[in-house]
Amino acid sequence: MKLAKLSLGLALAVALCAQQSQPQTQREFDCYVQAAEARMDSRPAFVLAEGNPALDNQLVRDKSIQTILANGANPHKLSGGQLYDWIGAVFIPGATLEKLAGMLQDYDHRANYFPETISTSKLLCRTGKDHFRYTMRMKEPAVIDVESDVVWERLDSHRYRCRSYSTKTSEVGKDHGYLRQLYSYWRFAEVAKGVYVEAETITVSDEFGAMTRALGSMLMGINPEKSLKHSLGSMRESVLKPGLQIPALPDGLPECGAAVRPGGCATSSAR
């Protein structure tokens, strides 16, 4: 009986500790995001291939999809969680900015364009042509419903950028903690022969042991790099599909209200 009470007490203590660690995890995530966004805004090249001939050759000549560590080795340790920060890049020959943006803003049909990673999606609201909220059901790393707030910005006739913040994540069935946050930052640059696409994704999952992380990509799909590659590959394949028809933005939806902003960081220790 004493052993049972001790076990119960330990279990409750662990559960309470996990609950208490969540606000700290969020604060550390907010600090990381603040530093990451400052880094993105201050870099000289709009897309990395502009100042990197080797990367440009890989994307254009070799037609490859490249992933790059955005801020050192992954995962980054958070209190009670782990964060992955990846940059992915692809060149889509023959694509145009208008067609690509139109496809990506078709939030009701994302499963048609990203069949490897998304099973369903629905646009919830929109404000004009630059602010959207939508929900999608992801297939990996598990069946996860994600609601996101998205803002598009057209910089000039040849460049777009877009940011997407998850506002709610919910794993269907048992909650393994595979995905707590999904922030993504997209850049699109049109040139004479096509469009450069670059994305930086910042994801957070619960803290897993070393063995789980080592086996994650093989057994459980805890692999944001792989998911990013799948998304870029599907994007290229879908926008180049012959006869692609993209519906107009739907009318009759509510406006989205104020755009979501991540919490700030009061400390100077963010990475």
What are these regions (language model features)?
Residues A18:
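Cofactor-pocket helix-loop regions in the catalytic cores of large enzyme subunits
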Residues M1-K2:
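N-terminal secretory signal peptides that target proteins for export/translocation
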Residues S21-R271:
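Eukaryotic helix-grip
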Residues K5-A15:
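Bacterial N-terminal signal peptides
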